[in-house]
């Protein structure tokens, strides 16, 4: 599982030029799954994200988590996080989980974040979306469950 986490002042998702979800501060998460991801992977990543200390304290050090600070989450499915561009000029997405599995895990991920007490807005799984993000910092962090659990 990969999550591109962006700390933001605001973020929104539009489908066919209509805003369907938006937040006014917190985290924008672009979320992708691979074949070997499981509900346990989802649980691990959700807990990791809500506990990450990526907001500044009064000393301007990243020392406060979203759980401590408060804020919303915009979660957007993003199978292209598993693009393989090692050969040729066209990306391959064979490392991405099949849509049915990915959608199940994506729904579970959003449920875990909601159960942790956050307002979670989402995109539309599998849809062509326009995502607008006003980064705060900017702070952008790539989380990869394979790298984190070694």
UniProtKB/Swiss-Prot annotation:
For this chain the motif Gly-cisPro motif, important for rejection of L-amino acids maps to 137-138
The record's top EC class is hydrolase
Of the GO CC terms on this record, one is: cytoplasm
Question: Which GO molecular function annotations are given, in alphabetical order?
Answer: D-tyrosyl-tRNA(Tyr) deacylase activity; Gly-tRNA(Ala) deacylase activity; Ser(Gly)-tRNA(Ala) hydrolase activity; tRNA binding
- One biological process GO term for this chain? D-amino acid catabolic process
Q: Which SUPFAM superfamilies match?
A: DTD-like
Name where it's found. Cytoplasm
The record's subunit annotation is: Homodimer.
Per the record, the domain comment is: A Gly-cisPro motif from one monomer fits into the active site of the other monomer to allow specific chiral rejection of L-amino acids.
> What's the name of the protein?
D-aminoacyl-tRNA deacylase
Q: Which organism is it from?
A: Listeria monocytogenes serotype 4b (strain CLIP80459)
């Amino acid at each position: 599982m990969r999550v591109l986490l962006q700390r933001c002042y605001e973020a929104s998702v539009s489908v066919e030029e209509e805003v369907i979800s938006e937040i006014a501060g917190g985290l924008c998460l672009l979320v992708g799954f691979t074949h070997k991801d499981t509900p346990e992977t989802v649980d691990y990543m959700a807990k990791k994200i809500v506990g990450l200390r990526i907001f500044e304290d009064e000393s301007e050090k990243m020392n406060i988590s979203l759980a401590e600070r408060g804020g919303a989450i915009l979660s957007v499915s993003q199978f292209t996080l598993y693009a393989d561009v090692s050969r040729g000029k066209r990306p391959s997405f064979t490392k991405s989980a099949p849509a049915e599995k990915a959608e199940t895990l994506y729904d579970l991920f959003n449920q875990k974040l909601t159960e942790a007490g956050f307002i979670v807005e989402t995109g539309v799984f599998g849809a062509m979306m326009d995502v607008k993000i006003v980064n705060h910092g900017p702070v952008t962090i790539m989380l990869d469950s394979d790298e984190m659990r070694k």
